[in-house]
Design a protein with these regions (language model features):
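Acyl-donor binding region in acyl/amide transferases
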Residues: 72-114
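Polar/charged alpha-helical tracts
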Residues: 11, 18, 37, 41-44, ...
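Charged interaction scaffolds used for protein-protein
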Residues: 5, 45, 51-53, 96-102
Length: 114
């Protein structure tokens, strides 16, 4: 089974949000820093980016939320949330996010984990 990763434009996030919200809220429940409503608002604003990893059966296996941040001397891509099921089928797509971040001018990746 193949999987693909899709980055959603801030204007399209609300359309696909129902596919991601449950996984994202579960991740937020363990994080405590924000909830799914906060993530949705930040994605719609363009502050956060929403990625979905889907299988050729249209099943959503994972949701990833990133944020590109500018520090005084470096631009970084933070992976704020990575949540899903059957990670061996999709975890390799994190490399796709890293490649995208490099295209955005990011020199470094930062990952938040519990």
């Amino acid at each position: 089974m193949q999987t693909k990763i899709v980055l959603f434009n801030q204007n399209d996030v609300e359309k696909v949000w129902p596919l991601a919200v449950e996984m994202i809220q579960l991740a937020c429940d363990t994080n405590g820093g924000f909830d799914a409503k906060d993530v949705l608002a930040a994605c719609k604003k363009g502050t956060f980016q929403l990625w979905l990893i889907v299988g050729d059966n249209d099943k959503v296996y994972a949701s990833v939320v990133t944020e590109v941040r500018n520090y005084p001397k470096i631009k970084v891509c933070d992976i704020k949330i990575t949540t899903g099921v059957m990670y061996k089928r999709w975890f390799h797509h994190i490399d796709d996010i890293a490649a995208w971040a490099k295209e955005q001018g990011c020199k470094k990746m930062e990952v938040f984990a519990r």
